[in-house]
Amino acid sequence: MTIDTRALGFGSSDRAVYAADPWTSRGRLYPEDGSPTRSDFQRDRDRIVHTTAFRRLKHKTQVFIAQDGDHYRTRLTHTIEVAQIARALARALKLDEDLAEGVALVHDFGHTPFGHTGEDALHEVLLPYGGFDHNAQSLRIVTKLERRYAEFDGINLTWESLEGLVKHNGPLLTPDDVGTRGPVPQPILDYCELHDLELATYASLEAQVAAIADDIAYNTHDIDDGLRSGYLTFDMLEEIPFLAGLMAEVRARYPHLEPSRFTHEIMRRQITRMVEDVIAVAQERLSLLRPESAADIRAADRVIAAFSGQMAETDSQIKAMLFKRIYRNPDIMRIRAGAAQIVTDLFAAYMANPKEMQSHYWVDHIAGLADAPKARHVGDYLAGMTDTYAISAHRRLFDHTPDLR
C-alpha cells in the first residue's frame, strides 16, 4: 500500500514567515532520506523521546533528591512541563511547535545526578581536564554518546535542533569571537568544526520560547515543591508583590479554599500571566523587527521571546526568594554537601580503578588511555548516572555513604 502524502495533516499548520521551516532545514551531519509521514523536526522530537538519556531524567534531581518523595519534581517531570509551555508559546506565535518542543525536551540531557550540586562537583574534579558544562554534555549525548543507530553515533538531529540546544540561552560568541559567558566549551567548538552552529547569532524563535519556558516552569514549580516540603510558606510568597496579588485574587474568589487547591490556583495563574507576558513582548518586538524569515530572527540584535521589564523584576524576586529559602536552606545545604561527596568519591574511585565502573563498554574504552581522555570517559559515565544509581554505586564501593534525606 502507498501513502497519499497530500492528505496528511503534518506540516500544514499556518506558520509565520519567521518560523523555522522543516522543509528548508539545513540538514543533518549525516544525510538521511526524509520521511513521507513526518517532518524533520517531528523526527528529531521523536528521536529525543526514545533516547536512554530521556528515560534517565526520571531519576535525576530537579531540586529535591530523587528519593525524597513521589510527588517532587524530577528532571523528567520538569522537562515535560517545559515542553508543554514551549509548545503553547510556539502555537501562539505561529512557530514550528515540533522544533520548540524538541529543544525543550532535550535541554536538560546533560545534567548530572543531584542537579547543579552534581554538576559543580563534576566540574571541580574535571577542571584539570577541561571542566564540565551541562550544555556541552547535552550536545555530546545527542552527537556521540547515544549509540542506537547503525550508521552513526548520536541521534543525528537537524542543524536547527542542535542550534537550539546549544544557543537557546543566546549567542555564545560576540561578533569578535569573544565568549559571551566565558570560554566556549571545547565539545561545542569541536562540533562546530564539522557542522557550524553559528555561535555568534541568536537561535531560532522556537529555541527562544523553549528557553523562556524553562524559566517559567522551574520558578513556578520550585515554589510548588517548596510549599510541599515546608521550606516555603504562604507568608513568604506574600513578600513578592506579583505573588501577593495572585494570592489576593484567589482568596477573593475562593475564600475558604484548602491549602493544596489554593497552591494550585496560584501556580496556574502564575504560569498563565508569565506566558501572556512573553507573548505580548514577543509580538511587540516582532512588530518592530518585521522579520521576513527565520534568518532575520537569528540576525536580530536582541532576544525576541522575553519577559517585560516588570515581569523580569518579578522573575528576579522569585529567584532570590528560592535561593534564600530553599537552595541555601541548611537542610538542603547538608544534602548538597553529601551529594557532592558522592560524585567526588566516585570519580576518584573510577580513575584509580576503571573496572569498578562495572560496564564493559566504558572499561574497554578506558583501557590504556592517558589521564585526560580517561577522565573525560569517567565524567561521561558519572554524568549519565541517575541519583539512585549514584547512591547505590557509592554504597557498593565505600563503607559510609552520606544520608541524602
Curated annotation (Swiss-Prot):
Keywords: Hydrolase
Domain of life of the source: Bacteria
UniProt-recorded Gene Ontology molecular function terms: dGTPase activity
One BP annotation, GO: dGTP catabolic process
Domain HD residues, every copy: 75-219
SMART domains: HDc
NCBIfam families: dGTP_triPase, PRK01286.1-1, PRK01286.1-3
Protein family membership: Belongs to the dGTPase family. Type 2 subfamily.
UniProt protein name: Deoxyguanosinetriphosphate triphosphohydrolase-like protein
Organism: Rhizobium leguminosarum bv. trifolii (strain WSM2304)
